[in-house]
């Protein structure tokens, strides 16, 4: 009897843990928000799942990861505790959206992230973000 109970509990635990997988957001805004939050929380492994898998995007992602990780622990904590402020959402067409955002830690710094729909899924296209940064400098 104890063995059957143990097996039942063990099987339930396995099924429950399999259902805890994080699902890829299905809307442009949700992908942008999840990506930004993962970056703020220094969760690059999860953030990279939202990036459009292209060489240039991967290079930009690695560059921003190195820059962000070079910050002090205190500053990383401030970013982690920050909330996202969505300043503007521009739907350019049915497969491209640009989200202008800042965060509660650095309200005065506004950034943009472009999300594109590829094969029915939304992804972050960092080429737009880095082009914006280069145009400012």
Question: Model-found features: residue ranges?
Answer:
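Exposed beta-sheet edge and beta->alpha loop/turn motif
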Residues: 76-78, 83-137
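Bacterial signal peptide processing site
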Residues: 19-21
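C-terminal motif of bacterial Sec signal peptides marking the signal peptidase cleavage site
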Residues: 14-17
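Sec-dependent signal peptide recognition
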Residues: 2-9
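Residue-level detector of alpha-helical recognition elements and their boundaries
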Residues: 11, 50, 62-63, 130, ...
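Short solvent-exposed beta->alpha transition segments
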Residues: 24, 29-30, 34, 44-92
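A generic structural signal for short
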Residues: 23-24, 101
């Amino acid at each position: 009897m104890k063995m059957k109970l143990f097996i039942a509990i063990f099987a339930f635990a396995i099924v429950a843990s399999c259902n805890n997988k994080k699902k890829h957001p299905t809307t442009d805004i949700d992908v942008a928000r999840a990506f930004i939050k993962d970056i703020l929380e220094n969760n690059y492994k999860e953030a990279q799942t939202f990036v459009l898998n292209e060489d240039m995007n991967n290079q930009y992602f690695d560059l921003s990861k190195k820059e962000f990780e070079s910050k002090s622990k205190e500053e990383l904590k401030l970013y982690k505790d920050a909330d996202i402020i969505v300043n503007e959402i521009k739907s350019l067409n049915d497969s491209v959206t640009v989200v202008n955002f800042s965060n509660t830690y650095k309200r005065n710094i506004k950034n943009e992230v472009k999300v594109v729909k590829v094969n029915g899924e939304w992804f972050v296209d960092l080429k737009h973000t880095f082009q914006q940064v280069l145009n400012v400098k």
